[in-house]
């Protein structure tokens, strides 16, 4: 293994399946913990905002969600950085890596402009959708603070989460993300309540704390990357290249659209569940929260697959690229199967983390939530499969067809099926969740089939070149 965690294609034979599994797990583990740390920051914000009352929680929560959606969609464009670096390293063309890094850095700053603009108009946008004036004003104030975090988020999360794993430096994400949870909690409490000698800013203190934490995270990651001699040659000073920026954007924009298609599916499902009543919505939120936590692991495996498939594809080793992808798919399905088994075996224990099971007022929600967790056990397996499959295809720089597959699966199959089950078959929230499962299953099958075809074709082309 090289110091950065990749077997050099020119120096060693392609790895065995067990080595693929070990290397993928080693790369995915810090990414999963970093993503769980980001979720922990969100939970911290929610808990501390809740101490100010429901109005502050509603405004802060909506403002944070709005910011998260906008920035996450734009971060999708930057996923192109990881696969481009992986291809360059696999092809033993590491002199290209600094050009990719600095072009990606410039692209991050450019993407921050629409993020800043959208968050600046949060209040009029909410008013246009008929939200109450007081809520729209408070959300607008919250988003106006968070907009200043957009450049830091696109650099610290978008760029660094793509670049660092591709050069074998994923562990830096882990430690900095864990530290960020503590810093965010300290600043949130201090700025909300005026503790520790900090000014008391009320609910805007949470937005200020999050903004500061995001910038500290970005600055720390950049400093660690540039200051470590092992990685300094990857970031040697060079000018961004416009043609390369076009290439990165061309690979990345379909990923951003895919993120948007998936996000709107879950948003629409949540709004539709809300029509069925408070108990249904509460049960839906519990099941979705549990599924979201488990999803961080296959999401990280998909990011690792992106890098490893890209590396071996760049190295001209199509069999190794294919094996890297299918091993990652196996790991994702295996983890989500175990996670699903937990949901089947102990649904009441899980729901008990959110609600008092012996409270009669919660009885209907508890029954429905445990039922949804049973569906989530199936839902999780195909959800993990589709996100890892998407990562494998990104490793082959194949993003446009997966985008179309997501559109078809989520909105052509998933939501219509769920709506029919919910309101015509009388299954209610359970029907909507079966629709989600159907949509995710169709996308998972399409992604896996596409990777099978693309990776096999890559091998055929390599054989043809060898014979020529």
Curated annotation (Swiss-Prot):
This entry carries the following GO cellular component terms, namely:
plasma membrane
Q: Name one Pfam family in it.
A: MatE
Q: Where in the cell is it found?
A: Cell inner membrane
Question: Is Membrane there in the keyword field?
Answer: yes
Q: Name one GO molecular function term.
A: xenobiotic transmembrane transporter activity
Keyword Mitochondrion in the entry? The reply is no
What is the annotated role of this protein in its UniProt record? Multidrug efflux pump.
Instruction: Indicate the family of this protein.
Output: Belongs to the multi antimicrobial extrusion (MATE) (TC 2.A.66.1) family.
Q: What is this protein called?
A: Probable multidrug resistance protein NorM
